[in-house]
Regions:
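Conserved active-site loop/cleft motifs that coordinate metal ions or position small ligands
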Residues: 31, 212-215, 254-261
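Active-site beta-loop-alpha junctions enriched in small/polar residues
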Residues: 6-10, 35-37, 72-74, 112-114, ...
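Short, electropositive alpha-helical surface patch
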Residues: 81-94, 119-132, 159-169, 195-200, ...
Length: 293
């Protein structure tokens, strides 16, 4: 079973700090950003400290392919403005090139919002963007990993059929999927009352063979709300029992599962949530314990 969280790139330590932070939580996989997730600034490759990070991973028996990278949140590959979309394509191309140099494989990406241009038009632009990015990085084995979205605003890819359309149209084994439990629940997939049918539907439409990463988050909102507000593990409307099914589902044991749950009084909850997950027992006092740290 692979469980971890997103971590910071920790100032001057960069990826060294990311790895050490993940290990302090008891993680055996984790997700990083190559720069601040809210902007496009990136430090020179030499300052990422990737070689030392790889030593830390090797000593901890963590496969580098279980270190996931998340693209900047502001990227929009469905952007109808040509120049803005070109900027996004160039940025993701560079992100993949840096990942290839380090040995990272999976780049999780919010595919984009159609900006009132319509879902079909948005998906067509995402497809075109993916094709350009993959052509720009054709020597690499990196994978563009489409995150399932909640359907907030004009987001694309809140339905499995949207993702199927992209995968089929791009036609490359370098396209995969990141399933976010909060997002699919908020999008209207009732994993609480219909877990097996939702997973079977995903398999029928997208294919479990395309599932590369799982974001394991609870939701502050009800099913179908299209809100995208994460809650701590077991403390939202999805609940502990359903989320623990995802973590220990035999079909998903080899897939990295990443917590993106909110801080509790400015304290990261991941060490405590991971311990609770490993114990398979819900602790209703967990948030109180974290807040007292």
């Amino acid at each position: 079973m692979k469980i971890g969280s997103h971590v910071s790139n920790n100032g001057n330590l960069m990826l060294i700090g990311s790895a050490l932070e993940a290990l302090s939580y008891g993680s055996n996989c984790f997700m990083v950003y190559l720069g601040a997730p809210q902007n496009t600034y990136r430090k020179p490759f030499e300052q990422l400290n990737s070689l030392k990070m790889k030593e830390i991973l090797q000593n901890a028996n963590i496969n580098i392919e279980d270190v996931i990278v998340h693209a900047p949140y502001i990227v929009n590959l469905a952007q109808p403005d040509f120049e803005k979309r070109k900027f996004a394509i160039d940025l993701i191309t560079k992100e993949l090139q840096v990942m290839a140099k380090i040995g990272f494989k999976y780049l999780v990406i919010h595919p984009g919002a159609h900006m009132k241009n319509g879902i079909d038009a948005g998906l067509d632009l995402i497809i075109d963007s993916f094709k350009q990015i993959l052509a720009n990085t054709k020597e690499d084995n990196t994978v563009l990993t489409i995150e399932t979205m909640a359907g907030k605003g004009s987001e694309c890819c809140f339905e499995f059929s949207h993702i199927k359309k992209i995968i089929n149209a791009v036609g490359s084994n370098r396209v995969g999927v990141c399933l976010d439990t909060c997002h699919i629940f908020d999008a209207g997939y009732d994993i609480v009352n219909d877990y097996d049918n939702v997973i079977n539907n995903f398999n029928d439409v997208v294919g479990l063979n395309n599932l590369k990463v799982i974001h394991i988050n609870d939701s502050k909102n009800v099913c179908g709300s299209h809100k995208d507000r994460h809650a701590n593990f077991g403390f939202g409307n999805i609940g502990f029992d359903t989320l623990i099914k995802f973590v220990y589902d035999e079909r998903f044991l080899s897939i990295p599962k990443i917590l993106e749950t909110p801080y509790v009084n400015d304290c990261p909850p991941y060490k405590y949530e991971i311990e609770m997950i490993k114990n398979k027992l819900f602790d209703k006092y967990l948030l109180d314990k974290i807040s007292k740290e």
